[in-house]
Amino acid sequence: MSEYLFTSESVSEGHPDKMADQISDAVLDAILAEDPRGRIACETMIKTGIIILGGEVTTSANIDYEAVARETVKRIGYKHHEMGFDGETCGVINILGKQSVDIAQGVDRDHPEEQGAGDQGLMFGYASNETDVLMPAPITYAHRLVQRQAEVRCNGQLPWLRPDAKSQVTLRYVDGRPVAVDTVVLSTQHAPDLTQAQVHEAVIEEIIKPVLPEQWITGETRYLVNPTGRFVIGGPVGDCGLTGRKIIVDTYGGMARHGGGCFSGKDPSKVDRSAAYACRYVAKNIVAAGLAERCEIQVSYAIGVAEPTSISVETFGTGRVDSEKLTRIVREHFDLRPYGILKMLDLIRPIYTATAAYGHFGREDEGFPWERIDRAEEIRDAAGL
């Protein structure tokens, strides 16, 4: 019998790095809504009283970037000066430039099927049958905790909560399956007039217990709520936020490998984003088809070249079909060229702001087409099962 612990973390929409991600993706969506051919690489930095937008944009759209940034911050909940950051009054500096023509000539083609990758790189996608959304359990429940924190903050159930929060979930695994919650950490920003005891009780009863599976809670489960004792100063006042700083939160919580490229602020011509989504789509359909209990896909590209330089499939000993055959099936049934991905997943749409908090994967809301399992039957038939 194999027994071990595994931990993943998440952060709320009001965490400064996630605020930066959401601003970058709000800029992306604003451009795509007016100019589907726009090329965007928008980076955001946010700190006390100021938002800085940088990066490269080529578009015919006329965007009020300052208004996009302010509205995003206010939607998250930073709209009163007593929180230390106010979307109405903060400064916004825009230093967005144009995309290099050297990159554009490698990406743009007369025939869209020949569209080259916007950069070299490697991307991964992963799926596991340990949750209903075919994601690793630790990151799934870490996300659900901070989503619940936002829910009870916004619906007035716990009105003294503030937007910044972090969660961390440690699960006990036996023979590769999660069986118990070992430790939960939840740190949440709050109003200054709350005691630690009040915060501790409310967080456990109103956030943690409604989210975690009851059968996984044991007498040894530990709850660590605001373990420093106080969390009043938060958001961009407490920490500087930058786009792309939460790439493990965005993906699989450390359970799968990562190619290093972030997602937010990048239009879908950039394979850092689109190919990672495609890899998740492929891996999820393989697991949904019953071809493996766990599956990780790697794909790589060269700048300006349409065909992937490599595709590999790893099933960690859980596959019902050998990896060589699975790789052939992937090549035959999924077009992983940049334009093929855009078409397959219908990515040239303003759908990205919603991805920028609570994870890009395991989300079954509208606007996450890479979470569909519509190819499962097709590839199961191809495998002869």
Swiss-Prot record:
<keyword id="KW-0630">Potassium</keyword>
<protein>
    <recommendedName>
        <fullName>S-adenosylmethionine synthase</fullName>
        <ecNumber>2.5.1.6</ecNumber>
    </recommendedName>
</protein>
<feature type="binding site">
    <location>
        <position position="239"/>
    </location>
    <ligand>
        <name>ATP</name>
    </ligand>
</feature>
<comment type="subunit">
    <text>Homotetramer; dimer of dimers.</text>
</comment>
<comment type="similarity">
    <text>Belongs to the AdoMet synthase family.</text>
</comment>
<keyword id="KW-0460">Magnesium</keyword>
<keyword id="KW-0963">Cytoplasm</keyword>
<feature type="binding site" description="in other chain">
    <location>
        <position position="56"/>
    </location>
    <ligand>
        <name>L-methionine</name>
    </ligand>
</feature>
<comment type="pathway">
    <text>Amino-acid biosynthesis; S-adenosyl-L-methionine biosynthesis; S-adenosyl-L-methionine from L-methionine: step 1/1.</text>
</comment>
<dbReference type="InterPro" id="IPR022628">
    <property type="entry name" value="S-AdoMet_synt_N"/>
</dbReference>
<comment type="function">
    <text>Catalyzes the formation of S-adenosylmethionine (AdoMet) from methionine and ATP. The overall synthetic reaction is composed of two sequential steps, AdoMet formation and the subsequent tripolyphosphate hydrolysis which occurs prior to release of AdoMet from the enzyme.</text>
</comment>
<dbReference type="Pfam" id="PF00438">
    <property type="entry name" value="S-AdoMet_synt_N"/>
</dbReference>
<feature type="binding site">
    <location>
        <position position="266"/>
    </location>
    <ligand>
        <name>ATP</name>
    </ligand>
</feature>
<keyword id="KW-0547">Nucleotide-binding</keyword>
<keyword id="KW-0808">Transferase</keyword>
<dbReference type="GO" id="GO:0006556">
    <property type="term" value="P:S-adenosylmethionine biosynthetic process"/>
</dbReference>
<dbReference type="GO" id="GO:0005737">
    <property type="term" value="C:cytoplasm"/>
</dbReference>
<feature type="binding site">
    <location>
        <position position="239"/>
    </location>
    <ligand>
        <name>L-methionine</name>
    </ligand>
</feature>
<feature type="binding site" description="in other chain">
    <location>
        <begin position="164"/>
        <end position="166"/>
    </location>
    <ligand>
        <name>ATP</name>
    </ligand>
</feature>
<feature type="binding site">
    <location>
        <position position="17"/>
    </location>
    <ligand>
        <name>Mg(2+)</name>
    </ligand>
</feature>
<feature type="binding site">
    <location>
        <position position="43"/>
    </location>
    <ligand>
        <name>K(+)</name>
    </ligand>
</feature>
<keyword id="KW-0554">One-carbon metabolism</keyword>
<feature type="binding site" description="in other chain">
    <location>
        <begin position="245"/>
        <end position="246"/>
    </location>
    <ligand>
        <name>ATP</name>
    </ligand>
</feature>
<dbReference type="GO" id="GO:0000287">
    <property type="term" value="F:magnesium ion binding"/>
</dbReference>
<dbReference type="InterPro" id="IPR022636">
    <property type="entry name" value="S-AdoMet_synthetase_sfam"/>
</dbReference>
<feature type="region of interest" description="Flexible loop">
    <location>
        <begin position="99"/>
        <end position="109"/>
    </location>
</feature>
<dbReference type="InterPro" id="IPR022630">
    <property type="entry name" value="S-AdoMet_synt_C"/>
</dbReference>
<dbReference type="Pfam" id="PF02773">
    <property type="entry name" value="S-AdoMet_synt_C"/>
</dbReference>
<keyword id="KW-0479">Metal-binding</keyword>
<dbReference type="InterPro" id="IPR022631">
    <property type="entry name" value="ADOMET_SYNTHASE_CS"/>
</dbReference>
<feature type="binding site" description="in other chain">
    <location>
        <position position="15"/>
    </location>
    <ligand>
        <name>ATP</name>
    </ligand>
</feature>
<feature type="binding site" description="in other chain">
    <location>
        <begin position="230"/>
        <end position="231"/>
    </location>
    <ligand>
        <name>ATP</name>
    </ligand>
</feature>
<dbReference type="GO" id="GO:0006730">
    <property type="term" value="P:one-carbon metabolic process"/>
</dbReference>
<dbReference type="GO" id="GO:0004478">
    <property type="term" value="F:methionine adenosyltransferase activity"/>
</dbReference>
<dbReference type="Pfam" id="PF02772">
    <property type="entry name" value="S-AdoMet_synt_M"/>
</dbReference>
<dbReference type="InterPro" id="IPR022629">
    <property type="entry name" value="S-AdoMet_synt_central"/>
</dbReference>
<feature type="binding site" description="in other chain">
    <location>
        <position position="99"/>
    </location>
    <ligand>
        <name>L-methionine</name>
    </ligand>
</feature>
<dbReference type="InterPro" id="IPR002133">
    <property type="entry name" value="S-AdoMet_synthetase"/>
</dbReference>
<keyword id="KW-0067">ATP-binding</keyword>
<feature type="binding site" description="in other chain">
    <location>
        <position position="270"/>
    </location>
    <ligand>
        <name>L-methionine</name>
    </ligand>
</feature>
<dbReference type="GO" id="GO:0005524">
    <property type="term" value="F:ATP binding"/>
</dbReference>
